[in-house]
Curated annotation (Swiss-Prot):
Transferase is among the record's keywords: yes
This protein's name: Amino-acid acetyltransferase, mitochondrial
GO molecular function terms attached to this record: L-glutamate N-acetyltransferase activity
GO cellular component: mitochondrial matrix
Keywords in alphabetical order: Acyltransferase, Amino-acid biosynthesis, Mitochondrion, Transferase, Transit peptide
EC number: 2.3.1.1
Region (Disordered): 37-70
Length: 724
């Protein structure tokens, strides 16, 4: 098969409506030729020509058959990877809104011809995004769902909107020379699949620790060639290596991109750009090695439009318009760090890794946590803990105990897990975690809040890209392939598992997920009273004097948050009368995008007048009175996880209870995050709690929980009773 025909086939597989008719068109050619040869038996010359060309035709057919088989297998692996990463309808709609389908102009259907149809090489069309309308075409169930496909005409003419933003993922591949060929191929395959889904990739190849600059440049070039070859070997993959794209004035400073278009041209052609960490001096044109983190920062600044040169005398409005145009041209959606050390480990509290990091709230705390862990390596530790902690730092804890943190534990809690004496390798690993954390903090600050980052291992990405039969041994049994972390993240903009999900809910089937950390610039978190100063308790003076009329609280926005989340009007005065005087605290995420109101409730068996007696204070029930998230923030951005984690890990780690209607669709989310649940007979309420030892070790506490959940009266303006 000619190179041109190969390119045609590779291109046509991206348009499923074309691929669906490909076998019929291709095999119609041999049948037509056979009929013509039979008709030509009357002419000896034609018969002789047929005898010479028939073996060539059979050889050509066999070659094309093998090519189609390879393409079919590649498509099968791609669709399987996509389906195993499939998400909810809400998340699919969000993905389609971020990656809109290419505009289509429908043509009237034409009847299929019975005569021979030659396979003519069409003009190759470069798509700036992904056309999910045709992508989901062959699946019948999805075909009937308007979310994934609009219209039913199979033959369409595509018009490309070149003004659509180019979605880009900046990828850092760390210590590439330590990775085997199989891992490199798996990473290349995943990057190719991301390209098919509309996410162009620009990869910075870090060769790893090298002694001198000359060896560094040589190793960087070798590893870039290695990755490029692996990408080109993938079905439909195209790599473009760039060696001379960076310049800098002097050593030590962050380089700059020579030309913006040098990056954009191959990206718009669906090529995966591979950048070597080498910069040239503007004065001497001498090449020098550059830290890969500095390259990532330089690329981020360039693609974000921050390196645009403007005339100081230019009208500020013109400058703003030009800057806005640059930002609309490119959308840096993902920052991906593929590092053998994996996600960021946690050394405080019971969690073993940070699965989701709200940078606005947690960056300083996690950075300090890692620095303190490095400092503690110099102290004495029980050697029995060495193997456990080595796994925690080196592989970011690939064990079944999986939990992340949104809000770090308070100083009053236990500080650090013991660390091993042998800290050479450990120290290096933790330093790598600190550098990765700082890199994503610096780059996410330059990007819109919608951008996100993810840290994971190349091995995990490679394994999830491989077919399941290649992963399982003969003695193993599996029903489905592992979820491709990067594809799942592209579709959902979330970690593979909710960060507020307790480790007990995950079982032993998700060890690889703890090797990843999902990061967003996020939002600030306001907690009243501040548990870092005064822990929440019934006898806390801060809690006793806190009311919703506090000047630190924007009551009108809080009421709007509650009414928008519950889709009901609140009787504000009645609600204030009920909760003021018994508030435990308030948690607000961002600009009132989410929040929780918690109270200390008195069990009905205790008279209200005796509520504050010292002997009754331990029996006051920590109660989640309102948990609300704006509709526009529900299911996105991790707002609910941030608030919930603050509640159960920072404010009330000893436990909290709440109730929910039996028909509330959020109950599954509650159920997964609670230690227990109980249906309240004779009502439409279900009770949840996170308190350890209830009811096995504390039956009185359980009875108090149930009594409080039964006795709370709603404060809605419609005055509906509890049975609503």
């Amino acid at each position: 098969m000619s190179l041109q025909s190969s390119r045609v086939l590779l291109h046509r597989k991206h348009d499923w409506s074309t691929c669906r008719n490909l076998p019929a068109r291709w095999w119609s050619h041999p049948r037509s030729y056979h009929q013509e040869s039979q008709h030509a038996d009357r002419k000896p010359a034609s018969a002789s020509a047929s005898a010479w060309t028939e073996p060539l035709s059979k050889s050509h057919s066999r070659s094309s058959g093998r090519q189609r088989a390879r393409e079919k297998m590649a498509d099968k692996e791609f669709f399987l990877s996509l389906l195993t990463s499939a998400t909810t309808k809400r998340e699919a709609k969000a993905y389609l809104s971020r990656f809109p389908s290419v505009k289509k102009t429908k043509l009237p259907m034409t009847p299929k011809k019975e005569a021979a149809v030659e396979l003519q090489p069409p003009k190759e069309i470069e798509k700036p995004g992904v056309n999910l309308g045709s992508f989901y075409g062959p699946t019948r169930s999805v075909l009937q769902t308007p979310v994934f496909r609009q219209g039913s005409t199979p033959e369409i003419e595509t018009a490309i909107n070149l003004d659509e933003a180019l979605h880009v993922a900046l990828v850092k591949l760390t210590d590439a020379q330590s990775l085997d060929d199989e891992t490199i191929h798996g990473v290349a395959l995943t990057l190719s699949q991301l390209t098919r889904l509309g996410m162009a990739s620009c990869v910075v190849v870090d060769p790893g620790p090298v002694k001198d600059a000359t060896t560094w440049r040589k190793a960087a070039a070798e590893q870039a060639d290695r990755l490029s070859a692996a990408i080109d070997a993938c079905d439909g993959g195209k790599a473009r290596r760039l060696d001379s794209v960076l310049v800098r004035n002097k050593d030590g400073e962050v380089p700059k991109v020579i030309s913006r278009q040098v990056l954009l041209r191959p990206l718009r052609k669906n090529h995966i750009v591979v950048v070597t960490p080498v910069a040239y001096s503007e004065q001497t044109c001498k090449a020098s090695s550059v830290a890969s983190n500095d390259v990532m920062i330089a690329l981020t600044r360039e693609l974000a439009g921050l390196e645009r040169k403007h005339d100081p005398d230019e009208d500020p409005r013109v400058t703003a318009e030009n800057f806005a145009a640059l930002q609309k041209e490119i959308s840096v959606d993902r920052l991906i760090v593929l590092d053998p050390v994996g996600g960021i480990p946690a050394f405080k509290g019971p969690q073993r890794a940070h699965v989701f990091v709200n940078m606005e709230q947690e960056f300083r705390g996690i950075e300090t946590e890692l620095q303190e862990a490095m400092a503690s390596l110099e102290g004495y530790v029980d050697p029995g803990t060495e193997s456990d902690l080595s796994a925690a730092a080196m592989k970011s804890n690939p064990i079944s105990k999986f939990v992340a943190t949104e809000v770090t534990r308070m100083p009053t809690r236990p500080q650090h897990k013991p660390l091993p004496v042998n800290g050479g390798v450990m120290n290096s690993a933790i330093k790598e975690h600190v550098e990765n954390l700082r890199l994503l903090q610096q780059t996410l600050t330059l990007l819109p809040p919608s951008s996100s980052g993810i840290i994971t291992t190349p091995t995990d990405v490679a394994n999830s890209a491989r077919p399941q039969q290649d992963i399982l041994s003969v003695s193993q049994v599996g029903t489905r392939s592992s979820k491709n972390l990067l594809i799942h993240n592209l579709l959902t903009d979330k970690p593979a598992y909710s960060s507020s999900l307790p480790s007990e809910r995950l079982g032993r089937t998700t060890p690889s997920i703890v090797q990843s950390t999902f990061l967003k610039r996020g939002m600030p978190l306001t907690i009243l009273p501040d548990p870092r100063i005064t822990p929440w308790s019934p006898n806390s003076p801060d809690s006793r004097h806190l009311t919703l009329d506090d000047p630190r609280i924007d009551l009108s926005r809080l009421v709007h948050l509650i009414e928008d989340s519950f889709n009901r009007k609140l009787d504000v005065q009645d609600y204030l009368n009920r909760v003021n005087g018994r508030l435990a605290g308030l948690i607000i995420a961002g600009e009132y995008e989410g929040g929780a109101i918690l109270t200390w409730e008195t069990p009905p068996s205790i008279p209200e007048s005796e509520r504050n007696n010292p002997e009754n204070l331990p029996r006051l029930v920590p109660y989640l009175d309102k948990f609300a998230v704006l509709k526009r923030s529900q299911g996105a951005g991790g707002v609910a996880d941030i608030v919930f984690n603050a509640m159960v890990r920072t404010c009330l780690p000893q436990g909290v209870c709440w109730r929910s209607r039996m028909d509330n669709p959020v109950n599954k989310w509650y159920f997964e995050r609670s230690r227990g649940t109980w249906k309240l007979d004779g009502s439409n309420w279900a009770m949840f709690w996170t308190t350890p030892g209830v009811p096995e070790e504390d039956s009185l506490r359980f009875k108090d929980y149930e009594a409080v959940c039964r006795s709370i009266q709603p404060s809605w303006a419609d005055k509906k009773a509890v049975d609503d």
